[in-house]
């Protein structure tokens, strides 16, 4: 099996160029200068229509730290649900070590230890966790 060549891009045009250059999966976001934010609904839809490879969507309402307010968690939850409804392959989220979003029912903050992170969704669990390696 060939290794997955995932490329992080911040626009539809960059996604097309990455696929043409050999990417087998895309991480789609905007504003990489601030670490990446959630791309627009229109960009996500266009990628679904045109990209021949799966892509992950960055879910992040703003740049800066990874400590989010309750309102920001609700925004993130809505973005995740929209991605699910559209049929997006997956989403990418980043959180501080101690505050994790529960995606079941209402938005809740859960205290979890640094290495015991499990995300539960209505129909099951996330199947991948991407770490920085520390």
Predicted feature locations:
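Alpha-helix N-cap and loop-to-helix initiation/capping positions
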Residues: 35-43, 68-78, 100-101
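Active-site beta-loop-alpha junctions enriched in small/polar residues
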Residues: 10-12, 31, 58-64, 94-98, ...
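Hydrophobic faces of well-ordered beta-strands that scaffold small-molecule active sites
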Residues: 3-7, 26-28, 55-59, 91-93, ...
């Amino acid at each position: 099996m060939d290794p997955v060549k995932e490329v992080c891009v911040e626009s539809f045009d960059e996604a097309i160029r990455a696929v043409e250059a050999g990417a087998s999966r895309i991480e789609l976001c905007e504003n990489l200068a601030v670490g990446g934010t959630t791309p627009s609904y229109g960009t996500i839809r266009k990628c679904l229509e045109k990209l021949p490879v799966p892509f992950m969507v960055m879910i992040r309402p703003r740049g800066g730290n990874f400590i989010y307010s309750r309102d920001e968690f609700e925004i993130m939850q809505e973005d995740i649900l929209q991605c699910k409804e559209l049929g997006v392959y997956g989403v990418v989220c980043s959180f501080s070590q101690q505050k994790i979003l529960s995606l079941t029912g209402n938005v809740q903050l859960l205290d979890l230890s640094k290495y015991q992170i499990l995300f539960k969704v209505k129909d099951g669990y996330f199947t991948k966790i991407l770490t920085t390696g520390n």
